[in-house]
C-alpha cells in the first residue's frame, strides 16, 4: 500500500484497486504515527477488504502487544471479513490493467495477509482449538505465499529488476536496504532451503518457463486433508508470469504486489528459521521449509519499497537485528548489523518520526552500542505525556525496554517504578513485573518492600496456560519463591519474612536470560562483582578485579554496604583478612558463627555464573572461564536451578569467540577455526543440558541457534567451510 496518487505514471488509466489502496494507506499512516484513534476511524469508514484488513491489523496489534483478550474477537471479525472479501475478488472477472503482473494479483496478497493474521489471532486464544486453527491457517498461507513467490519472482528475488520509481514517490535514500546479489530461484519451494546459508553466491540456474504451476511441497495437512488446504484448493492456480524486461513503471499496486510477496515469503522463512530446533523438527514434518538468508533478502527487498508491507518488513528486520544483537552473545560482524539496523530505522523514521515502534528501535540501537544513557533519554522522551498521540500497547513496549535498560544501569528505583507501571498498561504476567520490581527493591536494601511485592505474586499468577503449560517465567518465579521459603525455614527464621534469606538479586538473576550484563560498562560489572564478593563461603577463584575490590574494601570501611549484606540481618563482618592474601586465594570473610550466605549448590552455581559473565565483559577471560566452568560443575548437585549448567556452557562458547576477537584486535595471532570448534563443542553440551523440563529452555535453544548462525557467517568471512 503505497503513498501517492492512485494513477499509473505515464498517462495510463488508474489501476482498478488503486483508489482503495491509496485510502487504506492513509489509515496506516495514522497508525504508524501513533494516532490509533484516527487510524481506526479511517478504516471503519469503509468496508472493502483493504479497510477491513486495516481495522483487523489495529485490533490484532492491540491484542498481541497488550495481550488484551477483548480485542481478539474484533480482530477475528475484521480479518475474517477481509479474507472473505478478497476471496470473492479473486474469483471475480478481472478488468484489463496496464501492469506487469496478472490482473487481480493484489487480492491474493491481501488474502494471504488476512489468513496469516487470522491464524495468529486464533493462537492468542491460548486454547488447543486455537492452536489447531492457527496451524491450519499458517499451512494455508504457506501455500499461498509459495505460489505468489513463484509468480512474482519466477527467476528468484535477485532477478527482480528495480523498477523506475513512480513519479510521486522518491526512491529510498538508504543504501543499506539494497538487496544483495547472487541468489537464483530454484524450481521448488522445498529446494530453497538447500541454498547455502553461508555461501555468498549461488550458481543455481533459474527455473525454466512452465505453463503450469510447479508442484508445491506436500505438507502434513495436505496429506491429511487431501489438499494443501481447503481454502487454497478453491483458488485459481497462479500462472508463472515472466516480466524480466518490463517497461511500464510500477505504480502503487505493483509495489504492493512486490513488497507484499517479498514480505510474506520472507516472514515465513525467518520465523521458521528462528524457532527452537525441537519445534523446527515439528514444523518440518508439517511441511514448512526455511532459509534464513533468503528470508533476510526478501524482507530487505520489501523494506526498500514505500508500500505498507515495506514498513512492516522494516519492523521485522529491526526486531530480528535487535534480537540477534541482544541474545546471540557474539556477532561475526557487529558493525554491519548495527549499520543495517540504523539504515532501516532512518528509512522509516523519516516518514513517521513520532511512531513509538521506531523510537523503541532507535533506543535499542543505542543500548546495543553501549550508550545506555542515550537509550534511556530516547525512551523517556518517547513517553512524554505531551505527545500529540499515543498508542498504549506500543507505549508498553517502550516502558518495558526502559525498565530493562534502567535495570542494566543499576538505576533500581526507576527500574522498579517502570516495571510496576507496565502492569497498568497490559494484562500479561503481572507476576513477572512484580518479581523484577522486588529484585530492584532488594538491591536498594528495602526488604520490607521486597517482601510485600513477593507476597503478592501467588495471587497474580494466572491459571491460564500457554499450550497447556504455565508461562515459562512464572514457572521460574514459583520455584524461586519456594526456594526462598525453604531456605528461611532451614535457617530457623520467620517464614513470613523469607526475603531475609535472599542473597543474590532476583532481578539480576532473571536478567541473565535477557543477557542484561553483556552490554554494560566495566564499572557496572565491577559493582555486580562487589555485590556478591563478600558472600560466604569465600570465593576460591580470584581475578584482578576481585583483588582490587577486596583491597578497596579493606582500606575504605565507609564504602556502601552491598544489598546482599544488608539482607543478611546478621553480624557478618565485611572486613577481609589481611590484604596480603595469596593471588590464588581471594580474601575471605572473618570467621563467624553465622550460617553461610549461600548454603546450596543452586546458589553457588548462580554466583559463579554471574561472576563469569561479568568477568567476560571485563575482558578478564581466564577468570571468566574458571567461574563458568565452576558454575557448570554444580550441574549434578543443583535441585532448582537446573538451567545454570546449560547457560554456563553457552556463555563459555561466547567467551571462546570474544577472547579470540579481543586478541585479534590487539594484534595477536589467533586461530578462529579452532576457537569455533571449541565453541561448537560447548554448544553441543549446552543443548544436551536444556531439555523441555529445564526452565526457559526454549530461549537457550534459540540463542544457541543464533550463535551458530553467526559462527557460520564468520566461517564464510574466513573462506572456510560452514
Curated annotation (Swiss-Prot):
This is Inclusion body clearance protein IML2. One of its GO terms (cellular component) is mitochondrial outer membrane. It comes from the Eukaryota. Belongs to the IML2 family. It is found in: Cytoplasm; Nucleus. Inclusion body (IB) resident protein that interacts strongly with lipid droplet (LD) proteins. Involved in LD-mediated IB clearing after protein folding stress, probably by enabling access to the IBs of an LD-stored soluble sterol derivative that acts as a chaperone in inclusion clearing. The gene is IML2. It comes from Coprinopsis cinerea (strain Okayama-7 / 130 / ATCC MYA-4618 / FGSC 9003) (Inky cap fungus). Residues 187-204, 576-595 have a biased composition (Low complexity). Keywords: Cytoplasm, Nucleus, Phosphoprotein. Interacts with lipid droplet proteins. SUPFAM superfamilies: TPR-like (SSF48452).
Amino acid at each position: 500500500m503505497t503513498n501517492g496518487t492512485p494513477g499509473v505514471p505515464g498517462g495510463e488509466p488508474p489501476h482498478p484497486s488503486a483508489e482503495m489502496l491509496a485510502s487504506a494507506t492513509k489509515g496506516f499512516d495514522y497508525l504508524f504515527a501513533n494516532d490509533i484513534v484516527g487510524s481506526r476511524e479511517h478504516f471503519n469508514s469503509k468496508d472493502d477488504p483493504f479497510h477491513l484488513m486495516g481495522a483487523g491489523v489495529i485490533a490484532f496489534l492491540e491484542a498481541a502487544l497488550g495481550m488484551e483478550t477483548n480485542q481478539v474477537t474484533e480482530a477475528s471479525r475484521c480479518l475474517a471479513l477481509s479474507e472473505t472479501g478478497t476471496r470473492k475478488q479473486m474469483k471475480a472477472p478481472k478488468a484489463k490493467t496496464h501492469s506487469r503482473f496478472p490482473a487481480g494479483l493484489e487480492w491474493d496478497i491481501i488474502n494471504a495477509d488476512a489468513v496469516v493474521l487470522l491464524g495468529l489471532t486464533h493462537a492468542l486464544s491460548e486454547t488447543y482449538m486455537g492452536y489447531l486453527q492457527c496451524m491450519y491457517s499458517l499451512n494455508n498461507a504457506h501455500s499461498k505465499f509459495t505460489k505468489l513467490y513463484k509468480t512474482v519472482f519466477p527467476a528468484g528475488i535477485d532477478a527482480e529488476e528495480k523498477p523506475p520509481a513512480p513519479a510521486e514517490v522518491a526512491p529510498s535514500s538508504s543504501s543499506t536496504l539494497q538487496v544483495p546479489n547472487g541468489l537464483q530461484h530454484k524450481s521448488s519451494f522445498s529446494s530453497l532451503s538447500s541454498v547455502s546459508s553461508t555461501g555468498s553466491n549461488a550458481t543455481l540456474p533459474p527455473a525454466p518457463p512452465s505453463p503450469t504451476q510447479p508442484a508445491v511441497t506436500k505438507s502434513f495437512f495436505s496429506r491429511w486433508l487431501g489438499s494443501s488446504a481447503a481454502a487454497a484448493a478453491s483458488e485459481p492456480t497462479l500462472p508463472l508470469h515472466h516480466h524480466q524486461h518490463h517497461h511500464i513503471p510500477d505504480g502503487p499496486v505493483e509495489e504492493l504486489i512486490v513488497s507484499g510477496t517479498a514480505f510474506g515469503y520472507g516472514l515465513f522463512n525467518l520465523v521458521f528459521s528462528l524457532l527452537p530446533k525441537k519445534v523446527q523438527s515439528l514444523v518440518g514434518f508439517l511441511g514448512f521449509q526455511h532459509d534464513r538468508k533468503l528470508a533476510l533478502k526478501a524482507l530487505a527487498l520489501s523494506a526498500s519499497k514505500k508500500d505498507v508491507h515495506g514498513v512492516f518488513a522494516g519492523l521485522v528486520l529491526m526486531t530480528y537485528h535487535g534480537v540477534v544483537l541482544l541474545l546471540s552473545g557474539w556477532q561475526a560482524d557487529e558493525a554491519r548489523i548495527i549499520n543495517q539496523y540504523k539504515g532501516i530505522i532512518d528509512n522509516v523514521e523519516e516518514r513517521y518520526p513520532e511512531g513509538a515502534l521506531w523510537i523503541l528501535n532507535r533506543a535499542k540501537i543505542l543500548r546495543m552500542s553501549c550508550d545506555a544513557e542515550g537509550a534511556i533519554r530516547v525512551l523517556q522522551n518517547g513517553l512524554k505525556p505531551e505527545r500529540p498521540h499515543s498508542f498504549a500497547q506500543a507505549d508498553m513496549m517502550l516502558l518495558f525496554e526502559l525498565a530493562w535498560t534502567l535495570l542494566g544501569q543499576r538505576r533500581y528505583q526507576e527500574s522498579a517504578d517502570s516495571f510496576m507501571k507496565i502492569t497498568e498498561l497490559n494484562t500479561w504476567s503481572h507476576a513477572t513485573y512484580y518479581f523484577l520490581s522486588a529484585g530492584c527493591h532488594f538491591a536498594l536494601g528495602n526488604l520490607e518492600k521486597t517482601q510485600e511485592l513477593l507476597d503478592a505474586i501467588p495471587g497474580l499468577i494466572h491459571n491460564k496456560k500457554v499450550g497447556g503449560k504455565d508461562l515459562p517465567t512464572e514457572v521460574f518465579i514459583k520455584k524461586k519463591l519456594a526456594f526462598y521459603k525453604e531456605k528461611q525455614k532451614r535457617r530457623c527464621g520467620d517464614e513470613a519474612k523469607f526475603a531475609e534469606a535472599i542473597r543474590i538479586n532476583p532481578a539480576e538473576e532473571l536478567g541473565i536470560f535477557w543477557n542484561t550484563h553483556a552490554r554494560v560498562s566495566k564499572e557496572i560489572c565491577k559493582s555486580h562483582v562487589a555485590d556478591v564478593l563478600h558472600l560466604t563461603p569465600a570465593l576460591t577463584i580470584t581475578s584482578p578485579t576481585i583483588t582490587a575490590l577486596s583491597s578497596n574494601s579493606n582500606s575504605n570501611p565507609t564504602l556502601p554496604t552491598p544489598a546482599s549484606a544488608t539482607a543478611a540481618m546478621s553480624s557478618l563482618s565485611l572486613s577481609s583478612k589481611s590484604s596480603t592474601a595469596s593471588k590464588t586465594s581471594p580474601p575471605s570473610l572473618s570467621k563467624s558463627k553465622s550460617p553461610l550466605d549461600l548454603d546450596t549448590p543452586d546458589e553457588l552455581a548462580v554466583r559463579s555464573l554471574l561472576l563469569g559473565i561479568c568477568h567476560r565483559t571485563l575482558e578478564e577471560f581466564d577468570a571468566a572461564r574458571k567461574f563458568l566452568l565452576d558454575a557448570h560443575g554444580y550441574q549434578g548437585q543443583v535441585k532448582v536451578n537446573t538451567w545454570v549448567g546449560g547457560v554456563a556452557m553457552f556463555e563459555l562458547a561466547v567467551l571462546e569467540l570474544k577472547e579470540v576477537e579481543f586478541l585479534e584486535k590487539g594484534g595477536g595471532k589467533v586461530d578462529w577455526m579452532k576457537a569455533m570448534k571449541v565453541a561448537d563443542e560447548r554448544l553441543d553440551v549446552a543443548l544436551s543440558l536444556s531439555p523441555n523440563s529445564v526452565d526457559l529452555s526454549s530461549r537457550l535453544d534459540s540463542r544457541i541457534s543464533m550463535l551458530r548462525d553467526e559462527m557460520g557467517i564468520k566461517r564464510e568471512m574466513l573462506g572456510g567451510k560452514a
